[in-house]
């Protein structure tokens, strides 16, 4: 997933969380999304936030969004690792 695809998918994911009124996951993600400059430290924080949402708030997110969340987390971690 390239950066453009990542940003499109992340925007759709955040929009879906807003529609669900999933305040817990939004509280974790919104301080890190959208990124201001896309620097490595921002990618690290976003990857960490995505992981936190996946682990701590899974019960508030439907299965199809969990798949998107896992994909976003993997892509953010890959961006940090330069893959």
Features from the language model and the residues they span:
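C-terminal-biased regions
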Residues: 1-83
């Amino acid at each position: 997933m390239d950066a453009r695809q990542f940003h499109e998918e992340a925007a759709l994911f955040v929009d879906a969380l807003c529609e669900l009124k999933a305040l817990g996951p939004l509280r974790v993600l919104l301080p890190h999304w959208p990124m201001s400059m896309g620097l490595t430290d921002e990618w690290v924080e976003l990857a960490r936030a995505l992981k936190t949402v996946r682990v701590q708030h899974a019960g508030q997110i439907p299965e199809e969004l969990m798949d998107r969340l896992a994909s976003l987390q993997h892509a953010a971690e890959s961006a940090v690792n330069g893959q």
